[in-house]
Amino acid sequence: MAAIRVSRHRLETPRLPRGKALRIALVSDLHGRVPSGLLELLREEKPDLIAVAGDLLEHYLPPGEKDDYHREIDAHSPPLSRLFISFLRRVDSYFVGRRRKKASGEEENLAVLSLLGEMAKIAPTYFSPGNHERKLSEAERERVAASGARYLENAWVSTDFGAVGGVGVSPDGEMLKALSQGSGVRVLLCHYPEYHERYLASHELDLVLSGHAHGGQIRLFGRGLFAPGQGLFPKRSGGLYGRHLVGRGLCNTTRIPRLFNPLDLPIVTLEGIAPSEK
């Protein structure tokens, strides 16, 4: 597997005192793989928090079957993008099936869930679902619960610095409202970058963390070529967009190579600018 590149980002927030900082590692789109060197990098970076923004696992629906995720794409994507996504889905399903003749998807997913437990030993870890976590098996749910990570699907939890929330394929507006009105730093995990303008921009959040776009698969002149849910030349395929950080992912799931698009471990530091209390 290709080497992982660490990308670094900084943002200021008035919800932390000056001189204080919150360091977050964004892990996204493992798709049942265990990337070589990921745990070592996380230990070296010493994050205060690890955010796993979806598609840790890999689950495919049978060809032709649709769920809420596909209906969301159908409702918001241009027709040409929908056709291309449908084609890629069929190709991926074929090659994934061939790859898993020797190891079932369940076995691979359980292996990467062990990685989730190792991440939780490094720093408090929060996991929100992507489109591949639509249907978790009972064994997978038990492994997530035992990992020490917090699973957040349309839910949020208080922390010593503020709050962390996570949404699924159908964001809960009331949950988002409650999170954005909380005290302290407000961090949201949302797998789908295209949801930012659609559902999240109206909420006051310090940081939104996403994946899903895989960097646009092929990057030309600093822009991705294609992303599911956004189509050709996506607006948000990888990098920092204001207070929205999109990870480029940590694996390749298609037969199309990642060109000019290395595996990505983003590290974002939120730096406090509020006057310190005397």
Where do the model's predicted regions map?
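Solvent-exposed loop/turn segments at secondary-structure junctions
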Residues: 31-32, 56-59, 131-135, 169-172, ...
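Active-site neighborhood of phospho(di)ester-bond hydrolases with catalytic His/Asp-centered motifs
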Residues: 25-29, 49-55, 103, 124-131, ...
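Beta-strand-turn-beta hairpins that frame and shape the catalytic cleft
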Residues: 4, 12-25, 149, 156-166, ...
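Alpha-helical membrane-targeting segments
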Residues: 1, 67-103, 218-243, 255-260
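Acidic, histidine-bearing metal-coordination/catalytic regions of metal-dependent phosphoesterases
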Residues: 1-37, 45, 63-64, 73, ...
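Binuclear metal-dependent hydrolase catalytic cores centered on His/Asp/Glu-rich metal-binding motifs
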Residues: 137-138, 142-149, 155-199, 203, ...
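Core catalytic region of metal-dependent phosphoesterases/phosphodiesterases
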Residues: 36-159
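Conserved beta-sheet core of the metallophosphoesterase superfamily
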Residues: 126, 193-274
